[in-house]
Amino acid sequence: MAFTLTNKNVIFVAGLGGIGLDTSKELVKRDLKNLVILDRIENPAAIAELQAINPKVTVTFYPYDVTVPIAETTKLLKTIFAKLKTVDVLINGAGILDDHQIERTIAVNYTGLVNTTTAILDFWDKRKGGPGGIICNIGSVTGFNAIYQVPVYSGTKAAVVNFTSSLAKLAPITGVTAYTVNPGITRTTLVHKFNSWLDVEPQVAEKLLAHPTQPSLACAENFVKAIELNQNGAIWKLDLSTLEAIQWTKHWDSGI
């Protein structure tokens, strides 16, 4: 079902990162009511830039580290919901690419995303009288087929795709729909230099960037298109400046 962002309230976790900031710029052009950015490091210049793009949109920043205990996330969300009354979309975008940092990669890329999602269900779950909502989780094409030199990062992104597909199937119970946007290799600081697992490939970043990539702005434009298309359970591939819905192959079914 098509979704209009006009007059909507959106929470964007890591909305000041490379793809995140360009996506935030595209979002404010859609005449949101509120864009609430949760990020680890404040960037007043970026917030001011977003506000200047569309002064009709209220842009708010809260410091947030996705690795905090879930109780702290719930406390922050209580503050946001008390102020806005309603939130329409949650975008989970926190991510790091450094396979030297195994525990932190898993904590940021997967556990933090699961915890933030779990926390907002307290406010959205229709079984608790909530209105439902939309979750957009940022995965990666490495969640389909790994960059095998960074198996920890790739593994977390595969987990995001699987978790989100499960959320989508739970929508009749919770009232919360979900889908993933999965960027291909995008020209951001994230991919300019990073560490492979056990240093199996010291030149992994350079080798990736020798192949065709996409600019961050093109990825951001397709990101917002995916939000507007609003297809529960969709697995979107955002690669080489295109947007494509992936048809996932089922190899097994639980039967329940």
From Swiss-Prot:
UniProt: NAD(+) binding residues: 12-35
Q: Where is the active site?
A: 153 (proton acceptor)
Q: Name one GO molecular function term.
A: alcohol dehydrogenase (NAD+) activity
Pfam family of the protein (one):
adh_short
Question: What keywords sit in the KW lines?
Answer: NAD, Oxidoreductase
Gene3D superfamilies documented for this protein = NAD(P)-binding Rossmann-like Domain
List the EC numbers from the record. 1.1.1.1
Q: Which residues bind substrate?
A: 140
Identify the GO cellular component terms for this protein: cytosol
Q: Which Gene Ontology BP terms does the record give?
A: alcohol metabolic process
Please write the reaction equations for the catalytic activity of this protein. Answer: a primary alcohol + NAD(+) = an aldehyde + NADH + H(+); a secondary alcohol + NAD(+) = a ketone + NADH + H(+)
Subunit composition? Homodimer.
Q: List, alphabetically, the PANTHER family matched.
A: ALCOHOL DEHYDROGENASE (PTHR42901:SF1)
Report the sequence similarity comment from the record. Answer: Belongs to the short-chain dehydrogenases/reductases (SDR) family.
The protein's name in its UniProt record: Alcohol dehydrogenase
